[in-house]
Amino acid sequence: MGVSDKYVRKVKVSCASLRSYTVELRREVIKEAFDKILKKIKILVNIEGVLIRGEYKGSILMLSPKGRIAIIKGPEEEKLKEFLDDLFS
């Protein structure tokens, strides 16, 4: 069990060719998860209470306050777990 298992409820591949994923967080730890993520990403856009767009390890992350994260140009599918574990560590 990795670090990300505490925070991640479900992961879906949005587009395999673009390495895009949708990550759904566990409701009970959304705030804690966002606090960890915000310490690690470079914030590009912050529309207060609507969307945060940031960059992490060459990938674009879009965080919604409802606990969804879109990852664009993310790691290969086999390395996604490692990427998420590092993001939440």
Predicted stretch roles:
Residues 1-45:
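Short Lys/Arg-enriched alpha/beta "domain-start" segment
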Residues 5-9, 47-59:
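Short amphipathic beta-strand starts and helix->beta connectors
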Residues 17-19, 48, 57, 65:
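A generic structural signal for well-ordered coil/turn residues at beta-strand boundaries
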Residues 21-27, 50-55, 71:
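Generic recognition of long tandem-repeat/solenoid scaffolds
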Residues 40-52, 86:
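Acidic, aromatic-enriched beta-alpha/helix-loop junctions
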Residues 59-89:
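Short, compact, well-ordered microdomains
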